[in-house]
Amino acid sequence: MESIIEDVRVRKILDSRGNPTVEVDVITWNGFGRAAAPSGASTGSREVAAFPSGGVDEIITEVEDIISSELIGMDAVDLQDIDLVLKEIDGTENLSSLGGNTVVAVSMATAKAAASSYNMPLYRFLGGNLATSIPYPLGNMINGGAHAGKNAPDIQEFLVVPVGAEDITEAVFANAAVHKRIRELIQKKDPSFAGGKGDEGGWVPSLSNGDALEIQATACEEVTDELGVEVRPSLDLAASEFWDPEIEKYVYRQENVQKDTGEQIEFVKEIIETYDMYYVEDPLHEGDLEGFAELTSLVGDRCMICGDDIFVTNREILREGIEMGAANAIIIKPNQIGTLTDTYLTVKLALENRYTPVVSHRSGETTDDTIAHLAVAFGAPLIKTGAIGGERIAKLNELIRIQEEIPYSRMADLPF
């Protein structure tokens, strides 16, 4: 059969931060798939383990000695069975034996090999003929928090989304235009700014949160007027990064201010209303489903309140959030949960409950473009994958190619 696995190969490669990660090749009788795993800087405590204690070098041996022998002879099309075998080999709840990065690289490479065996693109193999919508890109403009230095804003990501774009090409270039405009505005505010960038390609200025918000808003307005494409500001606060559990407050070091949960909710609500935010991710720490629910009840009819660290692509945790009305969107990062099967099941649960799935990169990335295909296959309205940088534009340029391949493609339907 065309898709019977004949070999599984693994190697250590670099990610965008210069750290080691794993890349896997799966070879079938008539196909080939390659995938590399990313890694995050700000991670949820309930994510699966990225690698075992021995790191990437231990994984090389595990794949060559154990995983390869188990998968050879299996049909790559039977992805659910293969993912189950990977979890059985690992034998732990959090994939600490093999590591979620290893499992996701094998899982994605297998799916690619299956698609290749039947001469199909991955988005078509996974999504079928109904996979015709292209996601809007969330672009990272200013980096702060865990993605930047000590003088940067506390808020981790100042994002934009070109909601008025008619196609993905227009969307990608609108984001790039905002990125350039923001540098100009930063340099006008601070002539000493040398153009430093963070892990995800956003600028890293020495600005307060308030000044960064003003620059973000101004750039969106100016580019919207110039291009005739509406661009809306968005945020990822990554609030767990500045939540202090000992004093139970959010510590904003730039302004030397501390906020309790009620003050944090009011602060985020005020930002959403003042700057017409389209999307806000992780506005509260990862253990505060109640706070997420309260904020969603206040602004969820006009702003996406998205959970990343709080859900970690885990459908059982998402189910808890759904029951409480916590958030109305969820970040989808395959390496948080380990397998494509589990990733798909989380997306399915989200869509069934009107939670918007947002397929996302990680801060430590590679030029692997798999998530572009997953976003189209899953029908995700948004993809979060930066605005510039080789490892970021690999996904964006792949979306442009996918759009060309689908003669009846359209931009995804947004919730508002």
Curated annotation (Swiss-Prot):
Q: Where does this protein reside within or beyond the cell?
A: Cytoplasm; Secreted; Cell surface
Q: Which residues make up the binding site for Mg(2+)? A: 236, 281, 308
Q: How is the cofactor bound?
A: Binds a second Mg(2+) ion via substrate during catalysis.
Q: Which Gene3D superfamilies match?
A: Enolase-like C-terminal domain, Enolase-like, N-terminal domain
Q: EC no.?
A: 4.2.1.11
Keywords, comma-separated and alphabetical: Cytoplasm, Glycolysis, Lyase, Magnesium, Metal-binding, Secreted
As cofactor, the record names:
Mg(2+)
Functional summary from the UniProt entry: Catalyzes the reversible conversion of 2-phosphoglycerate (2-PG) into phosphoenolpyruvate (PEP). It is essential for the degradation of carbohydrates via glycolysis.
> What is this protein's name?
Enolase
Q: Which organism is it from?
A: Methanothermobacter thermautotrophicus (strain ATCC 29096 / DSM 1053 / JCM 10044 / NBRC 100330 / Delta H)
From the broadest rank down, the organism's phylogenetic lineage runs:
Archaea, Methanobacteriati, Methanobacteriota, Methanomada group, Methanobacteria
